[in-house]
Structure formats: structure tokens, C-alpha cells
Curated annotation (Swiss-Prot):
Record lineage: Eukaryota, Viridiplantae, Streptophyta, Embryophyta, Tracheophyta
Extent of Low complexity compositional bias: 22-32
Organism: Arabidopsis thaliana
Annotated coiled-coil segments of the chain: none
Annotated EC: 4.4.1.-
Keywords, comma-separated and alphabetical: Chloroplast, Lyase, Plastid, Pyridoxal phosphate, Transit peptide
PANTHER family documented for this protein: HERCYNYLCYSTEINE SULFOXIDE LYASE, L-CYSTEINE DESULFHYDRASE
Stretch forming the transit peptide: 1-24
Designated name of the protein: Probable L-cysteine desulfhydrase, chloroplastic
Gene Ontology annotations for the cellular component aspect, listed alphabetically: chloroplast
Amino acid sequence: MASSLSPPEEASYHHRHTKRYTSSASSASSTTNGTVESSVSDFVKRPKISHPNYISSSEIESEFSHHDPDFARINNGSFGCCPSSILALQRDWQLRFLRQPDRFYFDELKPKISDSRSVIKRLINAEHDDEVSIVDNATTAAAIVLQQTAWAFREGRFDKGDAVVMLHYAYGSVKKSVEAYVTRSGGHVTEVQLPFPVISADEIIDRFRIGLESGKANGRRVRLALIDHVTSMPSVVIPIKELVKICRREGVDQVFVDAAHGIGCVDVDMKEIGADFYTSNLHKWFFAPPSVAFLYCRKSSNGGVADLHHPVVSNEYGNGLAVESSWVGTRDYSAQLVVPSILEFVNRFEGGIDGIKKRNHESVVEMGQMLVKSWGTQLGCPPEMCASMIMVGLPVCLGVSSESDVLKLRTFLREKFRIEIPIYFRPPGDGEIDPITGYVRISFQVYNKPEDYHRLRDAINGLVRDGFKCTSLSC
């Protein structure tokens, strides 16, 4: 599909977004010859590798050549991506286990997982290695924290009716976990209603203060605040540092930050954020194979971390959460073992992971503004409140009027136009006239190109010209 940029603009765009690290003998695909023997200190002590050049655009294409070339894949936020070189190293780890499982289990698994934890600890600026546990995903991490909350209610450490405060836009599975662990144990749940579209961070801060006051009503004590770092749908970067400070001033016992879209997408610094618990997937924006995440548990948290346990109980029960999480029975641990190699992969890009975040943010804003201009709509939040994802309003004339409509439209775009894109339904407010009720969430990752977004632009414009309505789509 022809680009809407002029040749000089196109050349400038690709120059800005493909300045990366070289593929030299130390690239991830050749590192360690499949044995992954380098010590963790080799990676964490050298945040930047001193190569004269950066990975080229053709090398990036090769790393992601397993992606279906017929699709505009602009939904990295849902499932992430993993480069071919890391997938090859993952396969090496899988074969090492299958080749001699006894030696792998007794001699290699725990120290290599410990290496991965050390990499994560330094990336997130945690104080101690044992504050970091590696788990399957952010959903598992939420279950660990909420399980502790449930036990506190059941054992009488929390009074029945004490509150857990969470954002209305919390991820669906986390809401279900709150229902399963907190509500069933006698806790009171307060949801903070957030606006969308969002005009400023102050709106969110003000609404959060109101939500906390509601949680504390009738003499209740707020035992846990559950705050997203980047909400999923709609996607907005939450001012978590400010919200954590408010929680401290208001006497909230513990703060848990759900950052499924954290590492590789936004700045993640445990000492600056100051939360008791923080979780982030590594397979969404840090190029890990699915699935792997970390759970940070601050040692000085109220109630300590000794009563945090993995929900899958193994013979490691009672040895600390980090050790419990390192063995939950026979399974494939390879996604956890390639973390040091992923750090080396991202350091092939100019600026490492920070450079990737910056370029992804700039690119997704640029593409979002291009779509807004073409469709005559608006962004869902100011550019500074998005990371590597941004919400873009769809033309009102498409007639998006329900959750069913957005699901059908998403399927239609995938099957007819080969575009992978999530869509959000925003119910109209009272008195609104012709509001935008449908928003697409576009992501930008290193493998994306402007033509991916041009395909979406042109598909929607074509539907508008044809008088398309969501009501025309069958179930």
C-alpha cells in the first residue's frame, strides 16, 4: 500500500525508527552458542554494548520474520512479540532439559533462574534479589498478592468489611481475582471511576482521592490499593507515583501496582515508585517468549513478605516466594531462563530498552495523530499519558453502540482487511450528542512500519465511504 509520506519524509521516518545496534559476533542469535553460559554480571554491568553500529532494519525484519507478513500486526499490547534469536535460545534450553533432566533440575535450573532474577532486579532498581520472583504472568502475580489479602481477612488480621480500592479500568482477570479472593473473604471492594477520554493526570488523581474517601467511609480501613500502571482498555498511563504517595498519606496498608504493560513500555523503578508490590509481564514489551513475568515484593512492606506464597504449592513451600516460584512442578521454564539473553538483544538497539521505549512512544503518537487527522476524531488521552499504545477515536458514523459491536468489528477488520486491532466501546454519557463511542487501541513495536497503520486508516475510510454500519455485521 502506498505511503502517505513524501519520499524525503519516508526516508527520514525509517532513519529515525531503525537506528539500532549491530549484529556482530555478540548478537543474541550467536551468543553462547545455544548454551547460555555467560554470567549474569556480563549483562547487568554493561547496560550498553560498545558496537559502532546498530541493528539494521533488515535484521529487525529477520528477527520477526515468523510474523504473518499478510497482516498489519498493530496489537503488540495484547500478546507481545519475541525475536527469532531468543526463540532459538529458548529451544536450546528446552532441549537441554529433555536431553538430561536430572542434571538440568539439580545443577542448572535454580542458579539460572537466579541469574534471571538478578537481571530483573537491576533493571527495575530493586534493593534485594529476593524481592523479585519470576512467575508466569501478571495474573499469577495478582493471585499471589490477593491470596495474602484473603488470608488476612479469614485469619482475623483484617476486619470484615475493610476495603480494597481498585480502578474501574482494572484488567478483567484481576477484577475476577478480587472477587474470588477479597469479596468471598468478607472484604469491601471500592472501584474508582475514571473518566475517558482523559484530559489530564489531575483528573485521575482527583477521582482517586474520591475513591479512597469512599473506601474509608463508615469507618472502614483501606487495606490494599490496587493501581494499574498502564490500563489495558482503554489504555492510559496512570500517574502511579502520585497515587502511591496519596495512599501513604491516607494510611492505606499496602499498594499493589499491576503493570502488565510495564517493563519495556514505561519507566519502571521500584525505589521511585515506592509500591509494596509491583508486577509486570516480560512477554508484552520486553521481547520474552510467552509467558513470563516478575513480581516485586518490597521487604519493608506492612505484614512482610513471609506470608506470600505461590498458589501452586510444591516441596519448596515455606522457602520464600522467590524460591517457591522457581519450582512449581515439572513444566517448561525456558521462558524464564532466556531473560539475560533478552537484555543483550535489546542492547543491540540504540539506547537499549530506554531508546526503544522512546522511539515506540514517538511513533505511536505520530501514527495516532495521523489517524485522527484522517478520520476527524480525537485521541483518548494527551500524548504524554500514553506509552507505546494510544487510543484513537473511530468515526461516529460507523455506529459502534455496544460491546458486541466492537467484537464484531474487530473480527471483521481481521478477516476482511487482515488487521489485528483491539477496539473499545465507550458508552455515551447523559446529554452527549453524537459522541465517539468506538476507539481503537494501536500499539507500536520495533517491527512495525507506517504502512501497517495506513492499512487501518484506509480500511476505515473505505467503510465510511461505503456507508458501513456495525449493525450490518452478523453475530
